[in-house]
Amino acid sequence: MVAFTEKQDALVSSSFEAFKANIPQYSVVFYTSILEKAPAAKDLFSFLANGVDPTNPKLTGHAEKLFALVRDSAGQLKASGTVVADAALGSVHAQKAVTDPQFVVVKEALLKTIKAAVGDKWSDELSRAWEVAYDELAAAIKKA
């Protein structure tokens, strides 16, 4: 069980709204960061076959869904101290054989993207809130 405060939840929620304000731009930041660190990740996402295209609705849709899952995980942590992931989500990640280092690359890209979205509102406290929510979601996906 993880202690996640009201303030941490509010930090994640407000910065998620900053991300949503320009999903095409921040989707490019996110997926470009992933591919810079792990070019082979391109094979895990069918919508990256032709590179990072901000006009591709699958690219922006997947980014929004992932960031929303982390935001929802923050809410679950605040409410119950645990995150429960959908079994289908776990199954997809297992089928694609997503590794722990790949989860780390995604976390780093997520943090870089949120930092870009919030600008000078970025702080260690904000970073930590996203890290905890993401780490707990990743753990739940691996168990699902």
From Swiss-Prot:
Entry-annotated residues carrying Nitrated tyrosine? 26, 31, 134
Q: Which Pfam families match?
A: Globin (PF00042)
Any one of the GO BP annotations: response to cobalt ion
List the InterPro entries hit by this protein, alphabetically: Globin, Globin-like_sf, Globin/Proto, Leghaemoglobin-like, Leghaemoglobin_Fe_BS
List of residues that carry N-acetylvaline: 2
Indicate the segments forming the Globin domain, all copies: 3-144
Gene Ontology terms: cellular component? cytosol; nucleus
The record's subcellular locations are: Cytoplasm, Cytosol; Nucleus
Instruction: Specify the superkingdom.
Output: Eukaryota
Q: What is its main location?
A: cytoplasm
Record-stated family? Belongs to the plant globin family.
Q: How does it assemble?
A: Monomer.
This chain belongs to the protein called Leghemoglobin 3
